Regions:
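Negatively charged, low-complexity tracts enriched in Asp/Glu with abundant Ser/Thr
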Residues: 1-14
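Generic detection of short hydrophobic beta-strand segments and adjacent strand-loop junctions
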Residues: 7, 44-46
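A broadly conserved detector of short glycine/acidic/proline-rich loop/turn motifs that flank catalytic sites
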Residues: 15, 22, 47
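Short, surface-exposed, low-complexity cationic segments
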Residues: 19-42, 55, 59
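Detector for Asparagine
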Residues: 6-8, 27, 75-78
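Acidic, low-complexity intrinsically disordered segments
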Residues: 46-90
Length: 90
């Protein structure tokens, strides 16, 4: 199991939290969540069951996690969640 990533990021004057974690070989899933004040705004789950037997699995999973984490940060900064953020604000 790979240690997860957590980042707080400012966007349009508010702080958002992005968390990415690995569920481990028994449940080979990478989960990334975007939070605003404890509320989940978005999530992405990726299975890596198809690569369990790959050499250096931990390193490969860590790279997949980093990319998925960065993708969530980019999507936030690119405004993909603005409608959802506006819904929660009203």
């Amino acid at each position: 199991m790979v240690v997860g990533f957590n980042h707080n990021v400012m966007y349009k004057g508010a702080v958002y939290h992005v968390q990415t974690e690995d569920s481990g070989i028994s449940n080979p899933l990478i989960t990334t969540l975007l939070y605003s004040e404890g509320t989940i705004l978005a999530s992405k789950k990726t299975s890596y069951a198809d690569i369990i037997k790959v050499d250096q699995l931990e390193k490969v999973v860590e790279e997949l996690m980093k990319e998925q984490h960065k993708e969530m940060l980019r999507n936030l900064k690119n405004g993909e969640f603005d409608d959802r953020i506006a819904q929660l604000a009203s």
